[in-house]
From Swiss-Prot:
One of its GO terms (molecular function) is ion channel inhibitor activity. This is Conotoxin ba3a. Pfam families: Conotoxin. The cysteine framework is III (CC-C-C-CC). Classified in the M-1 branch, since 1 residue stands between the fourth and the fifth cysteine residues. The keyword Signal applies. It comes from Conus bayani (Bayan's cone).
Length: 70
């Protein structure tokens, strides 16, 4: 009976606690991007630049009012 109680406590308490990913363990860039996912595309592009994600530009967008290469 004691073995069953130990197994139940491990399964019901310790296992779920071990599988939880704490917020402090997640990379800061991931948390930052997750918080900004509902922004419009222009704001999202600016946050990607802030996170260090490099974007390449097509040659057809070299016109000054182009927003994808700004």
């Amino acid at each position: 009976m004691l073995k069953i109680g130990v197994m139940l406590s491990i399964i019901l308490v310790l296992f779920p606690l071990a599988t939880l990913q704490l917020v402090a363990e997640r990379p800061a860039a991931e948390r930052y991007a997750e918080n900004k996912q509902d922004l419009n595309p222009d704001e999202r592009r600016n946050y990607l630049v802030d996170l260090g994600v490099e974007r390449t530009c097509c040659t057809a967008c070299n016109i000054p009012p182009c927003k994808c290469c700004a």
